[in-house]
């Protein structure tokens, strides 16, 4: 992975931490730590957290619970522990991001992008400020370039957010921005259990099926996709990846390398 990233030209640093399977609440807390640091200190580099989650359903801040269909369970919040232990099925959490309900689980790469948009002129609009629609299109481009590496043509659908392959949605995006620092991000279906999506109306879109890369490219693996995602992210945003430990990503200790 390091060698693959090193093919990139030098640019501002993107500190990348690739974790294994991380519970949603824990990953959410990691984002809050990094977000607070980036708001407090504009010199903190951009960061990308790449991981998978155990099964969980999340709703955006304004999501309609009707898209949970018949899914039963208390809707919780990532900043509070459930009143009683979850014994059956995935948790259901309402979070700050935009968008409707989605599913996260094994076989899906989730990327949490913490970027200071003030540093990214390519997402600026004509009004001289960062444009969140442009940022969303940049995230889509990351995913389109990623699937293209595996011989697949990723597509946008006007009026919707995400990436489709042959009419199947393979990537979902949901973001939140605080003082021009982004958090939350994207989810790319590599080889998840798609049956988990049948319990909901994914992203509130009833007439668009969900798909996965392995359906179109049977030999694809999670391990093969991860470095391509990172490289595509860096190419689209003009950054250079720097692999860091979790403690470095959280700012608990300084990285030995702070500039690419």
Curated annotation (Swiss-Prot):
Keywords attached to this entry: Acyltransferase, Cytoplasm, Transferase
Annotated BPL/LPL catalytic domain residues: 42-241
Site, as annotated: Lowers pKa of active site Cys: 169
Residue positions of the active site: 203 (acyl-thioester intermediate)
Subcellular location: Cytoplasm
Enzyme class: transferase
Keyword Metal-binding annotated: no
Pathway in which this enzyme or protein is active: Protein modification; protein lipoylation via endogenous pathway; protein N(6)-(lipoyl)lysine from octanoyl-[acyl-carrier-protein]: step 1/2
GO MF entry, a single one: lipoyl(octanoyl) transferase activity
Substrates-to-products reaction catalysed: octanoyl-[ACP] + L-lysyl-[protein] = N(6)-octanoyl-L-lysyl-[protein] + holo-[ACP] + H(+)
GO biological process per UniProt: protein modification process
GO cellular component: a single term: cytoplasm
PROSITE patterns: BPL_LPL_CATALYTIC, LIPB
Alphabetical list of NCBIfam families matching this protein: lipB, PRK14345.1
Family: Belongs to the LipB family.
Note: In the reaction, the free carboxyl group of octanoic acid is attached via an amide linkage to the epsilon-amino group of a specific lysine residue of lipoyl domains of lipoate-dependent enzymes.
Protein name (record): Octanoyltransferase
Naturally occurring in which organism (per UniProt): Synechococcus sp. (strain JA-3-3Ab)
């Amino acid at each position: 992975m390091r060698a693959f990233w090193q093919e990139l030209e030098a640019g501002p640093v993107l500190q990348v931490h690739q974790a294994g399977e991380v519970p949603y609440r824990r990953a959410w807390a990691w984002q809050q730590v990094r977000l607070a640091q980036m708001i407090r200190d504009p010199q903190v580099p951009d960061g990308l957290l790449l991981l998978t989650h155990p099964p969980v359903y999340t709703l955006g801040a304004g999501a309609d619970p009707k898209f949970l269909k018949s899914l039963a369970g208390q809707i919780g919040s990532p900043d509070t522990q459930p009143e009683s232990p979850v014994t059956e099925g995935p948790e259901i959490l309402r979070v700050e991001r935009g968008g409707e309900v989605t599913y996260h689980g094994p076989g899906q790469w989730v990327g949490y992008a913490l970027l200071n948009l003030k540093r990214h002129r390519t997402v600026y609009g004509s009004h001289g400020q960062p444009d969140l629609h442009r940022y969303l299109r940049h995230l889509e481009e990351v995913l389109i370039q990623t699937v293209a590496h595996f011989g697949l043509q990723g597509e946008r659908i006007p009026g919707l957010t995400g990436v489709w392959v042959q009419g199947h949605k393979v990537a979902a995006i949901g973001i939140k921005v605080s003082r021009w620092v982004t958090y939350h991000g994207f989810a790319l279906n590599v080889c998840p259990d798609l049956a988990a999506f049948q319990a909901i109306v994914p992203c509130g879109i009833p007439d668009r099926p969900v798909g996965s890369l392995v359906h179109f490219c049977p030999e694809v693996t999670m391990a093969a996709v991860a470095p391509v995602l990172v490289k595509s992210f860096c190419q689209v945003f003009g950054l250079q990846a720097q692999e860091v430990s979790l403690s470095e990503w959280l700012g608990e200790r300084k990285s030995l390398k702070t500039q690419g």
